[in-house]
Curated annotation (Swiss-Prot):
Single Gene Ontology MF annotation: metal ion binding
Organism lineage: Bacteria, Bacillati, Actinomycetota, Actinomycetes, Kitasatosporales
Details of cofactor binding: Binds 2 [4Fe-4S] clusters. One cluster is coordinated with 3 cysteines and an exchangeable S-adenosyl-L-methionine.
SUBUNIT field: Monomer.
TRAM domain segment(s): 388-456
Organism: Streptomyces viridosporus (strain ATCC 14672 / DSM 40746 / JCM 4963 / KCTC 9882 / NRRL B-12104 / FH 1290)
Residues annotated as binding [4Fe-4S] cluster 1: 23, 61, 95
Name of the protein this chain belongs to: tRNA-2-methylthio-N(6)-dimethylallyladenosine synthase
Annotated disulfide bonds: none
Annotated GO CC locations: cytosol
Residues where [4Fe-4S] cluster 2 binds: 169, 173, 176
This protein's UniProt keywords: 4Fe-4S, Cytoplasm, Iron, Iron-sulfur, Metal-binding, S-adenosyl-L-methionine, Transferase, tRNA processing
Major localisation: cytoplasm
Reactions performed catalytically: N(6)-dimethylallyladenosine(37) in tRNA + (sulfur carrier)-SH + AH2 + 2 S-adenosyl-L-methionine = 2-methylsulfanyl-N(6)-dimethylallyladenosine(37) in tRNA + (sulfur carrier)-H + 5'-deoxyadenosine + L-methionine + A + S-adenosyl-L-homocysteine + 2 H(+)
Entry-linked SMART domains: Elp3
Length: 505
């Protein structure tokens, strides 16, 4: 095959590559996009294809500062490749496509398909229509056509899965454009959610993450304010489901019945990611966050009382318009009081289309950077101190795939503790597969991981490990590896590695 017509076609079958940017909702949607394409006869391009697939799909994010620059830079990189290969197709979906529907094809006329957040199920049809009509297809739905979970899927993990319980958001945070792009909250019926989870468990999945822009508001669309706590308890009754997580909740909707369900349901993990955004009441009001510092710390206190070993993480924005030094000191105060295991910190930057972008009092970059560095230094210190408390504890880890970048050179494997802390452990003589469970003693703590340097105390082979082994064997003869444009995407870990819900990300 000449360099002029380089292609990743396999045996005459067209190949695809999906590149994902943004939150867990996009990761979940990308698994559906992959499933739709495989259902239509495409196969995944080999690992590291770098735009050489027959179809390249960008699932975009609209809330990162340079989201559009990144997209158009990547599209520009593909333009000469497509010029050499007329049969190649490029599709752009996700939040940026929903927002910039009218400009993408104008700025990148070599794009074949533009689709939004509400009609991902149309991708194969739009690709075929663009091929036949030889012109770009731009189709954006204004409301959800089908829950992503009802579409075919190509899950990135054999043992862990996302399960969408709702889409959209009813909040109006002034820094966030997500509600405008994903619409008002719409809840799935509990029976549909539980049926999907049971089907996943039957396939070997042992860990699920309940997913929504605001998971603990679940039930508002179906008229049941305790629907989320009931859903957690129902997950506890599913045989074979070992771990349940959820992301992301909103402090306004965090009620006592949810805390009780977390504490009383054994397979709901002792982990909570709850965005703070700011510790200042004045800034929270400007953000339109619907809670104040006292309310937030009160939830933390209740969670710690009910679940003493819970690992709590958060999102924080530094330098929101109008933030004073006193406001920032209030954020530092909450960080000291809450003692987060981890905090995902962001420097505020204008998001076009959001009220905050037009606010007075935009903070100079130098000031934002200085505050950001102080916050990161404080949180690093706290994360390390909290991790040191884990030394000497005996923990059950679910063995993870691809978590430890240095595992090969250190002869270690990696896994997740119940509270989602990352643990690197000594590789045992007995075969251990992703999805299996090992028991180890923690011997060392760093700010972002733990070590178990002694021998593994126990290895429990699981149905999840069986599922991984079966899938791995089946994949051996196929082209492998679609590059999702996120680091560490594939397994829902660490949650939220790239935050969703009410976060800025």
């Amino acid at each position: 095959m000449s360099s002029i017509d380089r292609s990743q076609s396999v045996g005459g079958t067209r190949t695809y590559e999906v590149r994902t940017y943004g939150c867990q909702m996009n990761v979940h949607d990308s698994e559906r996009l992959a499933g739709l394409l495989e259902d239509a006869g495409y196969v995944r391009a080999p690992e590291g294809s770098d735009g050489d697939a027959d179809v390249v799909v960008f699932n975009t994010c609209a809330v990162r500062e340079n989201a559009d620059n990144k997209l158009y830079g990547n599209l520009g990189h593909l333009a000469p490749k497509k010029a050499r290969r007329p049969g190649m197709q490029i599709a752009v979906g996700g939040c940026l496509a929903q927002k910039d529907r009218d400009t993408i094809v104008k700025r990148a006329p070599w794009v074949d398909v533009v689709f939004g957040t509400h009609n991902i199920g149309k991708l194969p049809v739009l690709l075929e229509r663009a091929r036949v009509q030889e012109e770009a297809q731009v189709e954006i739905a204004e409301s959800l056509e089908a829950f992503p979970s009802t579409l075919p899927t190509r899950r990135e993990s054999a043992y862990a899965a996302w399960v969408s319980i709702s889409v959209g958001c009813n909040n109006t945070c002034t820094f966030c454009i997500v509600p405008a792009l994903r619409g008002k909250e719409k809840d799935r019926r509990p029976g549909d959610i539980l049926a999907e989870i049971e089907a996943l468990v039957a396939e070997g999945v042992s860990e699920i993450t309940l997913l929504g822009q605001n998971v603990n508001a679940y039930g508002s669309d179906i008229g049941d304010r305790e629907a989320f706590s009931k859903l957690l308890r129902a997950c506890g009754r599913i045989d074979g489901l070992e771990r349940v997580r959820f992301t992301s909740p909103h402090p306004r909707d965090f009620t006592d019945d949810v805390i009780a369900a977390m504490a009383e349901t054994p397979n709901v993990m002792p982990q909570l990611h709850m965005p703070l955004q700011s510790g200042s009441d004045a800034v929270l009001k400007a953000m339109r966050r619907s809670y104040r510092q006292e309310r937030y710390l009160g939830i933390i206190e209740k969670v710690r009382a009910a679940i003493p070993h819970a690992a709590i993480s958060t999102d924080i924005i530094v330098g929101f318009p109008g933030e004073t030094e006193e406001d920032f000191e209030q954020t530092l105060h909450v960080v000291r009081e809450a003692r987060f295991a981890q905090a995902f910190t962001f420097q505020y930057s204008k998001r076009p289309g959001t009220p905050a972008a037009e606010m007075d009092g935009q903070i100079p970059k130098k000031v934002v950077q200085e505050r950001y560095e102080r916050l990161v230094a404080l949180q690093e210190e706290i994360s390390w101190e909290e991790n040191k408390k884990q030394v000497g504890r005996t923990l059950e880890l679910m063995v993870a795939e691809g978590e430890g970048r240095k595992d090969d050179t250190t002869h270690r494997l990696s896994g997740r503790a119940p509270d989602n802390r990352l643990v690197h452990f000594t590789k045992p003589e007995q075969e251990v597969r992703p999805g299996d469970v090992v028991t180890v003693e923690i011997t060392y703590a760093a700010p972002h991981h733990l070590l178990a340097e002694g021998p593994v105390r126990d290895v429990r082979r699981t149905r999840a490990g069986d599922a991984w082994e079966k899938r791995n064997a089946a994949e051996a003869a196929k082209p492998a590896g679609v590059m999702l444009g996120l680091p560490k995407v594939g397994v829902p870990e660490p949650l939220p590695a790239v935050t969703g819900g009410c976060a800025v990300d």
